[in-house]
Amino acid sequence: MPVCKNCHGTEFERDLSNANNDLVCKACGVVSEDNPIVSEVTFGETSAGAAVVQGSFIGAGQSHAAFGGSSALESREATLNNARRKLRAVSYALHIPEYITDAAFQWYKLALANNFVQGRRSQNVIASCLYVACRKEKTHHMLIDFSSRLQVSVYSIGATFLKMVKKLHITELPLADPSLFIQHFAEKLDLADKKIKVVKDAVKLAQRMSKDWMFEGRRPAGIAGACILLACRMNNLRRTHTEIVAVSHVAEETLQQRLNEFKNTKAAKLSVQKFRENDVEDGEARPPSFVKNRKKERKIKDSLDKEEMFQTSEEALNKNPILTQVLGEQELSSKEVLFYLKQFSERRARVVERIKATNGIDGENIYHEGSENETRKRKLSEVSIQNEHVEGEDKETEGTEEKVKKVKTKTSEEKKENESGHFQDAIDGYSLETDPYCPRNLHLLPTTDTYLSKVSDDPDNLEDVDDEELNAHLLNEEASKLKERIWIGLNADFLLEQESKRLKQEADIATGNTSVKKKRTRRRNNTRSDEPTKTVDAAAAIGLMSDLQDKSGLHAALKAAEESGDFTTADSVKNMLQKASFSKKINYDAIDGLFR
């Protein structure tokens, strides 16, 4: 409710006598509102007498009125106008109806609202919007058509299209018809005069695959590639899988899988002539996924039935050697063996399920309870089996009681041993010593320590290695030469570089051009008596430097070297000057007379 700014009153009255329809406060008479915005179109008159429209129009997406002509349009409005113009130009070139263009413009506005247009080329976004609208209407236009019209890479448009679908959450986008790809693939395969016939057969194969539920969930390029390959074979044209893969850009395994799925349909069993004449509309094949799952279920069921169909007790005992350990050396019939085998399998499955269900809670306690209970039940079942096959009353009863007592004592001893500190696995509480299903002769098998104890620690001792094994690692002369050629071929560049360095070094030594800088070595105080000459030379050099008062020590060093007899002073100066490039301003012949 409006409030007066002067007297804070809340009662107002509209002055209808005034053209501006002012809103006046009844208490103090202050005008609260004047010149309100109205929806009526009003006209005025200029100083020249021309009639003009008063006011301005504000659209739904505008924040304020536009002033100054067309150049004063908002940036958003200018962007939409440019996009509409470009959409119409592309639609006109590709013969796209106007209603699809309007739908593409709505997709563009939605992309602009989600900040998808910023930072992307406008041509890619426009092509993506048009392609989405065409896919919704199931037209024959493809991305390659927009690419050729806009002169943009089809992969660039495809990447923008995929990002746009993900950004705008575009769902229920109809799949492209494989028959659209068939024409493009046929043009790249160079089918000559049989192109029309191959395309016709491939389209019919695609329609047949669509009826047989092979189209749903598959890439259209894979379906089109398989149809093109079959159509070429139907027309006696030799086209390999590699050629189809290069054209359709799908994997060879995908192409072969489409062919295998089509092989299980009714249309695949017809001849070429019957397939062309008959539409095969009498029945549809089941989806490939349905057939594949039924085959898996049938295979599992057959394997289970085969395992349970034992004719004799020997087959059952050979199938499960643990059952032999449980039943001992008793003579049982086939039905009894199967009965105990079923009970044994059920008990073991329950133990495994219990351990899996309680994984990570307390594996040791769970295993103790399960293993002890199952061990007790197994012992009691042995007693019951023996009682069923032994006749008598008193003796058998006494023997059974004694065996039950033995079972109880054994279980209590096992419990004490487990509590005393037997090793239990920290993950699932497993212990090999208390495993009721462990084979009896497991302790007779050699362990890892037994094998390691036989291996000598001496690396040069090869007594434990057979001669045949050593000979297998030795190459004969032919294999050695072949391996040498391979190594030289792999390292040819390095060998050539090293050889060139060696030849260059020999040539420099022969010509006396030894200008290679030697690495500086750290001087050490050497006081050994086995090098008297170096000490004498150093002392002589120091004396010469002090006599000549040469700060640099160049003359002293040259004279010391000359006295030692290694080379003359002139030769050393020549060698020093030869290190640098030759100069026209130096008379090298005059160097011989410098130190005479």
Swiss-Prot record:
* Start and end residues of each stretch annotated as Disordered: 363-421, 509-534
Q: Cite the repeat ranges for sequence.
A: 90-166, 185-264
Task: Kindly list the positions at which Phosphoserine occurs in this protein.
Answer: S381, S384
Signal peptide interval:
none
Q: Which UniProt keywords apply?
A: Activator, Metal-binding, Nucleus, Phosphoprotein, Repeat, Transcription, Transcription regulation, Zinc, Zinc-finger
Q: Which CDD domains match?
A: CYCLIN_TFIIIB90_rpt1 (cd20553), CYCLIN_TFIIIB90_rpt2 (cd20554)
First-listed, main subcellular location of the protein, grouped into a coarse class: nucleus
Quaternary assembly? TFIIIB comprises the TATA-binding protein (TBP), the B-related factor (BRF) and the B' component (TFC5).
Cite any additional comment in the entry.
Answer: Present with 4330 molecules/cell in log phase SD medium.
Q: What is this protein called?
A: Transcription factor IIIB 70 kDa subunit
Q: Which organism is it from?
A: Saccharomyces cerevisiae (strain ATCC 204508 / S288c)
What gene is behind this protein? BRF1
